[in-house]
């Protein structure tokens, strides 16, 4: 690709089909708003047309240009990017639904970065960098990634420090929860629930009398299957409560009625983990080896709750039981989480923006100085 003269501002292209009320944009919107517009020019390439909502309006208003490319071909989008002289193209999708990865195969920008949407390597030499952290990709795991790694100093995941939690006060009765009894919660999508995770959950429910498991209702088929599997394991199906979908701010508010978020593995919570932590609900996770199995651990480390990260299934089960069986311990953890939220890095969007902008400046300068692409650590 022919090298252009540097723009006065570093021109960043963000590419996604999810600039709307979607998990990705809930995390990213405040980053777009916080970007230093005196140093960076932001251009959005939206792969999806659709009605406006509050998040889409916030996102589109934060860009210098917001371009709907839904009807354009991959080749046309790639050429448009080159015509606009994008310096750094940030792919927010990877291989997730409605992606347009061929845009990057055709080299839409001299520097191409994989971030957030896809929890792993692209496996392609067309992507130069992947944004991660030391929890997600330990040094010994770098060999499994085709990209060079941009290591953020804390968690790789940005969050919206202005995210709204509804003032609505739900009662347990209206949400189908018992007035008494411990509420285990997991609002991950049901495809993440593996048989061996479900085995552990059912054993925990047998050990904690009167406890219930609160899950998201994905589909009637999923509800029926999980109820059948609970019965097979000797747990009454009506002890599994399914939460209907609701607006995001109210969904965050209803987290207050849960006692403990118990994570899935090997595919752990991502946005759902930060949802829980933002709502002051502790999360117990089991860290694995892959990127997708280490995200909750990254978030818990950044919020100062690494003691909730376990390494084995037995540790996961025993720590969860210990917390569920000890009200004072649970209260101590919740107090620590509430205390840490305003002072730790996880929900500090301003600090995250400063760090990612430092990364963009470094990779831009290296490109124009003909320095080879290599791993970068932001401090």
PLM features: what roles do these ranges have?
Residues 198, 202-206, 317, 321, ...:
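A structural alpha-helix within SAM-dependent methyltransferase catalytic domains
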Residues 22-30, 190-203:
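A conserved mid-protein helix/loop that constitutes part of the nucleotide-sugar donor-binding site
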Residues 348-377:
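C-terminal alpha-helical cap of glycosyltransferases
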Residues 1-127, 134-142, 210-349:
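Conserved nucleotide-cofactor-binding alpha/beta core module
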Residues 1, 124-191:
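A nucleotide-sugar donor-handling region in carbohydrate enzymes
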Residues 1-14, 18, 160-174, 366-379:
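Non-catalytic membrane-proximal stalk/linker segments that position and tether the catalytic domains
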Residues 10-15, 178-194, 198, 356:
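Conserved donor-binding/catalytic core segment of Leloir-type glycosyltransferases
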